């Protein structure tokens, strides 16, 4: 179980997440740092309860999560072949990045000109440069910071493109011995889909409050735990940008 605060130009949304053997349950508990109204709370619980009442909806959710995880894994697996790396010294791990106080190896990366992406998923790597921070002792990726230095097409340019200047950051931290979790994900991209529809992704999500729970919970059991978690704690977050909802 963990908490995520996602911030976009429209404001912030706080969720409590719980991963189950069926799918990940995420319950909204605050907008712009303010707890939900009774009406919003009932609507949010009803949104999740539809997965409990409709097995087909839950199956689709699980399939989408699996597809997203596979896409991410393909990108990670491609990194050693897609990039050329150069030693850029060391940094010290801090809160949210690696293990606090422990050294991290910094490597700059740029595209490998001989790399041929096997699918449109990996195409974005051909126009990206940046750096990674590695825990060389535990063989863990603590951070990756990448920027598109040129426009990059995906689907070989047929499906669309991402504009030059797109930027992303992912931080990982050790939350307990040999257990690492993503602590921050920041995305800033613009482009076009099918050369017609504008694409704009601007978001930062911070994750905290990691607690270990049973991995054998059902989605229905997770929903009940999330309701209790929401009731037991008062959300105390800096107010985000006002948003119309």
Language model: regions and residue ranges:
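Structured extracytoplasmic
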Residues: 1-129, 137-142, 147-166, 174-176, ...
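Beta-strand elements of repeat-based all-beta scaffolds
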Residues: 171, 182-184
């Amino acid at each position: 179980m963990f908490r995520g605060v996602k911030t976009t130009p429209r404001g912030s949304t706080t969720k409590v997440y719980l991963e189950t053997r069926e799918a990940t349950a995420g319950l909204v508990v605050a907008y712009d740092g303010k707890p939900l109204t009774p009406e919003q709370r009932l609507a949010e619980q009803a949104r999740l309860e539809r997965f409990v009442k409709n097995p087909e909806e839950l199956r689709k959710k699980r399939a989408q999560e699996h597809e997203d995880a596979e896409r991410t894994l393909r990108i990670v697996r491609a990194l050693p072949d897609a990039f050329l790396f150069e030693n850029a010294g060391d940094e010290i791990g801090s809160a949210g990045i690696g293990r606090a106080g422990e050294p991290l190896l910094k490597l700059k990366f740029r595209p490998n000109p001989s790399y041929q992406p096997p699918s449109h998923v990996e195409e974005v790597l051909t126009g990206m440069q940046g750096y990674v921070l590695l825990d060389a002792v535990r063989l863990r990726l603590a951070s990756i910071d990448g920027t598109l230095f040129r426009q990059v097409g995906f689907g070989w340019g047929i499906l669309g493109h991402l504009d030059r200047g797109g930027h992303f950051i992912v931080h990982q931290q050790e939350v307990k011995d040999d257990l690492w979790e993503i602590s921050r994900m920041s995305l800033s991209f613009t482009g076009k889909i099918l050369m017609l529809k504008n694409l704009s992704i601007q978001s930062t999500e911070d994750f905290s409050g990691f607690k270990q729970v049973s991995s054998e919970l059902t989605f229905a059991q997770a929903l009940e735990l999330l309701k209790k978690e929401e009731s037991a704690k008062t959300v105390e977050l800096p107010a985000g940008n006002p948003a119309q909802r």
